[in-house]
Amino acid sequence: MNWVFLCLAILFEVAGTVSMKLSSGFTKLIPSLLLIFFYGGSLFFLTLTLKSIDVSVAYAVWSGMGIVLITVVGFLFFQEHVSVMKVISIGLIIAGVVSLNLIEHVAVSEPVHKSGQYK
């Protein structure tokens, strides 16, 4: 369930960012209210996520995947330019998120002494 909460946090964060763009600097009421709702929801689900996923992993996945998704949304819906360098950078973000997930699974299976040293 913890990864479901993290996915919801990411989706709410992306919806909040889209609402921010549509609010035109808080000059449009409905997008401004949606911005507050979606960012509040994102932080709510991120907080639930942190009960069972390390903050370093959860925050990296949340921010990294948020960047990836909002870049795609910007390209598809706001006609934002996507350069080759941006695509390479997004690929590196995805590789980092995958690496963090793999490391977390390895770390869970390796017990640690209270001193912080591996057995």
UniProtKB/Swiss-Prot annotation:
- Listed GO CC annotations: plasma membrane
* Domain of life per record: Bacteria
* Keyword Cell membrane attributed: yes
Identify the keywords attached in UniProt to this record, alphabetized.
Cell membrane, Membrane, Transmembrane, Transmembrane helix, Transport
Subcellular compartments: Cell membrane
So where does this one cross the membrane? Answer: 3-23, 29-49, 58-78, 87-107
Q: Which InterPro entries match?
A: Small_drug/metabolite_transptr, Small_multidrug_res
Membrane topology for this entry? Multi-pass membrane protein
GO MF terms here are: transmembrane transporter activity
Task: Kindly give the Pfam families that the UniProt entry links to this protein.
Answer: Multi_Drug_Res
The family assignment reads: Belongs to the drug/metabolite transporter (DMT) superfamily. Small multidrug resistance (SMR) (TC 2.A.7.1) family.
* Protein's name in the database: Uncharacterized membrane protein YvaE
Its gene is: yvaE
